[in-house]
């Protein structure tokens, strides 16, 4: 099954058999990418590509301070490690693992806020439109007082709205893009 067919059938299966095939295809892709990434990391090959130096901004510190809860020790450790990587100017490859509700998203919010305040655009890609919409709502709420422009881009976004969003991204009018695989289409510049 082709990748685009698998994406379609995972959301709108024509039959139970199509759903199973789509699920197997997407699981295979996920494991293949994971294994390839792990091989790159463990092979000791540094990426030759230069990254951007992005430091911790006062807004990120303020956001953490104003959360209605304290970050866990594991979250603080992961955040500090990733912030150090971002400040190094090297390309960062990280996998943040955790159960549902363990606090992975808040780390993404903080790191993407740092990117935006440093003058860069950032993207959060979610596996489903429902999750992308949830992230869009939570990011918008958490970052409302930081003058961050956030866009939602999914497969079901209407064509006119997509064109407008593509243009805003290209023109630098969007700081953070949240979406599904639609965010990695050729039209996104």
Predicted regions: what they are:
Residues 1-66:
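Upstream accessory/linker segments immediately N-terminal to the RecA-like ATPase cores of bacterial MutS
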Residues 156-177, 184-189:
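Conserved motor-coupling elements within RecA-like helicase/translocase cores
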Residues 69, 81-88, 92, 114, ...:
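Conserved helix-loop functional segments at active or binding sites
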């Amino acid at each position: 099954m082709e990748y685009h067919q698998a994406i379609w059938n995972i959301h709108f299966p024509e039959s139970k058999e199509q759903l199973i095939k789509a699920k197997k295809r997407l699981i295979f892709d996920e494991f293949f990418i994971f294994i390839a990434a792990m091989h790159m990391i463990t092979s000791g090959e540094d990426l030759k590509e230069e990254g951007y130096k992005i430091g911790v901004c006062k807004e990120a510190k303020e956001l953490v301070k104003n959360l209605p809860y304290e970050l866990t020790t594991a979250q603080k450790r992961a955040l500090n490690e990733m912030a150090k990587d971002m400040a190094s100017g090297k390309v960062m490859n990280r996998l943040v693992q955790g159960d549902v509700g363990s606090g992975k998203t808040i780390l993404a919010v903080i790191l993407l806020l740092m990117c935006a305040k440093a003058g860069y655009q950032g993207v959060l890609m979610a596996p489903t439109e429902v999750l992308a919409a949830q992230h869009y709502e939570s990011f918008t709420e958490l970052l409302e007082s930081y003058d961050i422009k956030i866009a939602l881009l999914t497969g079901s976004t209407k064509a006119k709205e997509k064109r407008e969003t593509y243009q805003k991204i290209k023109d630098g009018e969007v700081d953070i893009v949240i979406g599904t695989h639609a965010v990695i289409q050729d039209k996104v510049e």
